Amino acid sequence: MGIKGLSQLIADIAPFAVKEGEIKQFFGRKVAIDASMCLYQFLIAVRAEGAQLTSVDGETTSHLMGTFYRTIRLLENGIKPVYVFDGKPPDLKSGELNKRAERREEAQKALDKATEAGATEDIEKFNRRLVKVTKHHANEAKELLRLMGVPYVEAPCEAEAQCAALVRAGKVYATATEDMDALTFGSNILLRHLTFSEARKMPVQEFAYEKVLKGFELTQDEFIDLCILLGCDYCDTIRGIGPKKAIELINKHRSIEKILEHLDRQKYIVPEGWNYEQARKLFKEPEVQDADTIELKWSEPDEEGLVKFLCGDRQFNEDRIRSGAKKILKTKNTATQGRLDSFFKVLPSTGTPKRKVDEKKPLAGSSAKKAKTGGATRGRKPK
């Protein structure tokens, strides 16, 4: 889900924190990509006659085709991608995962009815709602990336948190995902739509975290509390509080604790046993691998390995795969020109910390000075 309504709230209050541009503007950049989000996009979008692409054995291959060609597109535009895969979901996410499972059950029932009625459009719609990225999909994508010479990272927990840690450490420029909670985890830069198909003709959106804080007049801690009020994957929300009210309350009271002290409990229903404190801790102290221990290396593609992996049972066209491998090799051999700012050392951010898997460190910089700009307008947009 990400953070409910956050992108629209930023557009309303801090539009200067968002830039739109083309993929070519990120030439020379290293970008950490939320792999699960990408695979989901590919499973939804890469289809033939409304159905996912499959091998001779009926195994889905849409995620492989999407990963192969979209990654080549990034490389041809001078971008060095590193894919970050989710690890074990945090316990706090169990409620959200249960809700997703229930929605899939409802979609399956609706699909059965649509199939019985022969409603083609409804069949395709509900089929898309049933899409789920599995461990098998992820493992196949990892093998493909290895053969392409593109690095990937296995996060111990949430991929967005690991991406943010890589950004803060100066290992990569930005996090690429559609989930706005990358900002809540402290990613200095968030890129949306980077891995979208060119056919969709949607500009890449670049969100600057520090500018968001400035526009909202919030510290990092206050921004996290705002995101919890808006709605995240880790706890319920207070019924009756939308985006406009949430930013108003945070600007006035500065924390959820103070909000609860002054809240009209008759008008706004607080969830019983609301675990907002645990959600806050998860955002401030996410379980991530120390970015300093991660080595990112882009190598030459294994053309024969790619042909063996993708052709044959998976039925990819050999000529196209060989052509793709040569394109990857060409980008590696010709990508010697860097960005002007790459001649200067990128210093790790000190604004938001990381912690190793076995360490717990508090979030630094949470007492950042508040800026003096902004106002609030209600907005709502899904992740």
UniProtKB/Swiss-Prot annotation:
Residues 336-344 are annotated as: Interaction with PCNA. Its main location: nucleus. Phosphorylated. Phosphorylation upon DNA damage induces relocalization to the nuclear plasma. Mg(2+) 1 binds at residues 34, 86, 158, 160. One of its GO terms (cellular component) is nucleus. This is Flap endonuclease 1. SUPFAM superfamilies: 5' to 3' exonuclease, C-terminal subdomain, PIN domain-like. Its cofactor is Mg(2+). Keywords: DNA damage, DNA repair, DNA replication, Endonuclease, Exonuclease, Hydrolase, Magnesium, Metal-binding, Mitochondrion, Nuclease, Nucleus, Phosphoprotein. Structure-specific nuclease with 5'-flap endonuclease and 5'-3' exonuclease activities involved in DNA replication and repair. During DNA replication, cleaves the 5'-overhanging flap structure that is generated by displacement synthesis when DNA polymerase encounters the 5'-end of a downstream Okazaki fragment. It enters the flap from the 5'-end and then tracks to cleave the flap base, leaving a nick for ligation. Also involved in the long patch base excision repair (LP-BER) pathway, by cleaving within the apurinic/apyrimidinic (AP) site-terminated flap. It comes from the Eukaryota. Mg(2+) 2 binds at residues 179, 181, 233. Its EC number is 3.1.-.-. Residues 1-104 are annotated as: N-domain. Residues 345-383 are annotated as: Disordered. Residues 122-253 are annotated as: I-domain. GO terms for biological process: base-excision repair; DNA replication, removal of RNA primer. Interacts with PCNA. Three molecules of FEN1 bind to one PCNA trimer with each molecule binding to one PCNA monomer. PCNA stimulates the nuclease activity without altering cleavage specificity. CDD domains: PIN_FEN1. Binds 2 magnesium ions per subunit. They probably participate in the reaction catalyzed by the enzyme. May bind an additional third magnesium ion after substrate binding. One of its GO terms (molecular function) is manganese ion binding.
